[in-house]
């Protein structure tokens, strides 16, 4: 038996995308009974990355098997609800069900938006003061990004700075950004070029700063990415069709010599918490991007994740910690 309930939350500040600011995230809470146990999942389509809201809703209402490559958000929600039910029945956290070692927390990054170099330095300093050891800097894909990188890396010696171009730079600009990043010791540059430019990624990888891909995972498999020198893959479970599919991709990446970073897609609390459990299972040398709850206003349930000294606690409670089928009341 499965129940589906729509929800809408606000993003503050709005998420800047290629098509303009995204001020709200709309999705569906999925309740699914497996045997005697009920689990809760979340399907929150991301425009431009997954199926549309209406397609997701139709997929959840249908009785056909869901394809994670066609309706990834819907598949994520249904699969997660089943995983939570299975974990609760076994009285273990989802992280344990996914193969995580006995960990209680995972390292996470803070995120700093596109702004002036002075504002970047201030924001990075605030993140460091809050205990973060890794900060992700959003870039504009412009020559001025070099100044932003210099400002960010100049704040503290013992903090990892990574940067994300969202595929916005042209090749000459990306070359200057990546060359500067190599000199400044940047952890990695994420999606410096559009996903289609494999030759450009190969050129950038030769400059000395590790290259990560996000959007590129939707167009190329990890073997192809490894062949052009990509070092890190960024995995959004909602976009890739669920936690188990990300685990398979991460295993393939590890075999090819690539590291994996798990990030949320500014989802609501159920999917964010699940992403943290997945990050605990994936592990790896890099901080994960699952500490995005401070951006969500009017969330659908209390957030069980707490960031302390740059880490989020996953916890040992069954399922997703304090999130159960009673965490979200559609009639409230």
Model segments located where?
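N-terminal capping/lid subdomain adjacent to the active-site entrance of alpha/beta enzymes
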Residues: 1-161, 166-175, 179-183, 207, ...
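Residue-level recognition of alpha-helix initiation/capping sites
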Residues: 118, 143, 172, 195-196, ...
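Conserved beta-strand termini and adjacent loop/short-helix elements that scaffold enzyme active sites
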Residues: 7, 111, 164, 214, ...
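Shared catalytic-loop signature of beta/alpha-barrel
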Residues: 58-59, 64-65, 199, 203, ...
